[in-house]
Amino acid sequence: MSTPHPAPASAYEPGAIEAAAHAHWTARDAHRVVEDTSRPKFYACSMLPYPSGKLHMGHVRNYTINDMMARYLRMKGYNVLMPMGWDAFGLPAENAAIDKKVAPAQWTRDNIADMKSQMQPLGLAFDWSREVATCDPDYYKWNQWFFLKLLEKGIAYKKTQVVNWDPVDQTVLANEQVIDGRGWRSGAPVERREIPGYYLAITQYADELLANVADPASPGFLHGWPERVRLMQEHWIGKSAGVRFAFPHEIRDADGTLVGDGLMHVFTTRADTIMGVTFCAVAPEHPLATHAAASDPDLAAFIETCKAGGTTEAELATKDKEGRPTGLFVKHPLSGAPVPVWVGNYVLMGYGDGAVMGVPAHDERDFAFAKKYGIDILQVVHVDGEHFSYDHWQDWYADKQRGVTINSGNLSGLSYPVAVDAVAAALAAQGLGDKKTTWRLRDWGISRQRYWGTPIPIIHCTGSGPGSDNPGCGDVPVPEQDLPVLLPEDLIPDGSGNPLNKSAAFLNVACPKCGAPAKRETDTMDTFVDSSWYYMRYCCPDSDAAMVDSRNDYWMPMDQYIGGIEHAVLHLLYARFWTKAMRDCGLVKFDEPFTKLFTQGMLLNESYYREDASGKKRWFYPSEVEVQFDDKGHPVGAIAREDGQPVQLGGIEKMSKSKNNVVEPRDIIAKFGADTARLFTMFAGPPDQSAAWSDSGAEGSFRYLRRLWAFATKQREAVQAAGTDFADASRAAIDLRRDVHLLLRQVSHDYDRLQYNTVVSGAMKLLNALESAALADTAADRAALREGLGILLRALYPAAPHIAHALWQDLGYAAAHGDLLDAPWPAVDEQALVQDEIELVLQVNGKLRGALKVPASADRAAIEAAALASPELAKFAEGRTPKKVVVVPGRLVNVVV
């Protein structure tokens, strides 16, 4: 039953209009979706937000993209799922708890309620019955359950490894979470620490993960993903074909045992340069480094300094390359020559074998290291017979196709592929190496030394204590029937470590195997675990018996995923892995979670600041400054309103609270209404590109909606009384119908290709066409008006649903065709596009002199006759006799006199 609507006001009042629309949709439970096999399904989802408590216009843009897609596809007959939830675990809640002395659970749930209250006025068609918060026990129970399944399959395992340690957030960071050597949340310089933790064997899936982003012939290739994202994942997975081999040695520890069994292994993709090795470098944690440091205090001190830094390739690529000699030597595997071993701060223990061969003549990093420390440089590859030059050393490394080995004994004179094969064969013959494929991708460490996350379901049993004959059971998985391991929600972190370690109620437990006193694991899971499968839980959020059920089979894989490019490597790669692991555990039947991916652009805004004597910047809100513009409208200066003194133009930047250039949706909605906020964020530019916020642009969108309201209410009686018969329509009505259906065809095309900025401009052109049509007061012309306005309202509805809904009700469309929620997308009337009259450009001696209207069926002779009879020709020919008439069909007529 339709909710009553108030009689429309003569003025556009978005507050009342939008409140009435919300009441109507709520009464109908309009956005609840159920599985329906009689219709094609479409699952469109935005990446779930972290509940920071504040919605910004970037959120509005992202969710409006999703909403426009969902509403349009529903009109096209699809059963569309558009859910929303909350990525609710994580460090910000703990940091806020420390600052505000409030439990993270309370802070998080308060923020969820606040953000939800900010979303609802936007009219987003989320199915809130499927809402998920990852901090709810009925969600993270399944994180724990699946972790135990992965443990059973050997995909989850425990090991001790050198990791990235964030000293501020006091937790381990995955390599992907270290940005320019700093923690992605805290911004603090990371350190290296050796620490035990749980890992997920994502590398077991490296081949499949790579194939679906790198090989178009792969059955699961992600054709619907942006090439940029596929390339980012391909690079991160980083498949490398090369040779793994060992440098033998006689280095022994204090007990006389060979360190590392007398072999120091390395991997190289350039085995053709093996005879150019003049040194080797090992990681600070390598057994040879540890052995040498035991008797060398200076080396030991250097190794300690190396720990003050992260373990990511990106960080090591940019930091200064430093090293210390160990005094140790290994043997070259082919020549037998002694090779000095150095400790290098740029070598990672977690990558390969923690050692690299140094070939200064043919590697940029090795060259810089050798020049710095006076190590020999030996050319072993040349191009076109040229010899090594310090000015052109890069050429010998980069040009694999033309390079030929030299100074390499019996391996000289070989091309790159032949040399690699020969070196691999020679090493294999000695049992020292062979060809191997390696990966840049590393297993995913999920242990975090933080409180606000999913508890890892492990119990540590050490037995019954001193004197007991019970040796303990070690690490024992929590029995499935005891899940979930509940996270206590009343703890308040104080910044001194994980509060779970101090909670006796959580920590102390009986061993499930032997009953002896034991302790729970206090590490929690990386929050990327939570976001790796939430989109499947949306499909069946009330499932108590299973992680996912048959409803997941109906909706998944997702048809369209929407989110920022910043998630290309972290979230999107983990989600792909998680899906494949679920498949291999028999939980899902598909290989990839997201058929199509859309990466929206950022919303930008002007920024303004003033620097104090110490160089610290104070950022001003746009409302706090007056800006001066040049004659082209470009900002050239600004002053603070508070004191009239200059402030600096920071330029157009991403909206950021730290720079005070965030535009609050609440402010825009209060001033202009939600439809204006939605409309401008779409009109500002292509959705996949960044766009700048503009107050004047928002005002322009508001003026358009006000014009639409004024025009539609003025035409109310004519539209309500109109029929659908276009017989005897006037020329103006015929032209209007053609314009309307041409625009409808274009708008439909733009919806299909997600070009929502041109959808909005198409809606604006539709209103222009309706306003400018000089229609007669006849039944046929009123029918053309009714049709055109109805098409406009449906075209605009996904972008500005409130005003479209109100006018649809008021103008009588709902009474005749049902609720706009259920209205089908309008079809293009091909007959309306057929022209019975066309307009040609009229030229005289090649100069534009007017326009010529002729029947669309007119042949060349009829067009010539019309041109010769036109008053424009008589005016500009000035009595001269036409010599020639040139007709360009469908475009122009040129009369030569």
Curated annotation (Swiss-Prot):
The cross-references to Pfam families, in alphabetical order and at most eight, read: Anticodon_1, tRNA-synt_1, tRNA-synt_1_2, tRNA-synt_1g
As annotated in the record, motif 'HIGH' region runs over 49-59
The protein's name is: Leucine--tRNA ligase
UniProt key word Oxidoreductase? no
Could you tell me where this protein is found in the cell? Answer: Cytoplasm
GO terms for cellular component: cytosol
Which transformation does this protein catalyse, written as a reaction?
tRNA(Leu) + L-leucine + ATP = L-leucyl-tRNA(Leu) + AMP + diphosphate
Query: Can you tell me which family this protein belongs to?
Result: Belongs to the class-I aminoacyl-tRNA synthetase family.
Name the gene for this chain: leuS
Q: State the species of origin.
A: Methylibium petroleiphilum (strain ATCC BAA-1232 / LMG 22953 / PM1)
User: Keywords, A to Z?
Assistant: Aminoacyl-tRNA synthetase, ATP-binding, Cytoplasm, Ligase, Nucleotide-binding, Protein biosynthesis
Entry's Gene Ontology molecular function annotations? aminoacyl-tRNA deacylase activity; ATP binding; leucine-tRNA ligase activity
InterPro entries from the xrefs? aa-tRNA-synth_I_CS, aa-tRNA-synth_Ia, Leu-tRNA-ligase, Leu_tRNA-synth_edit, M/V/L/I-tRNA-synth_anticd-bd, Methionyl/Leucyl_tRNA_Synth, Rossmann-like_a/b/a_fold, tRNAsynth_Ia_anticodon-bd
Q: Where does ATP bind?
A: K657
Name the PROSITE patterns for this protein.
AA_TRNA_LIGASE_I
Q: What EC class does the entry list? A: ligase
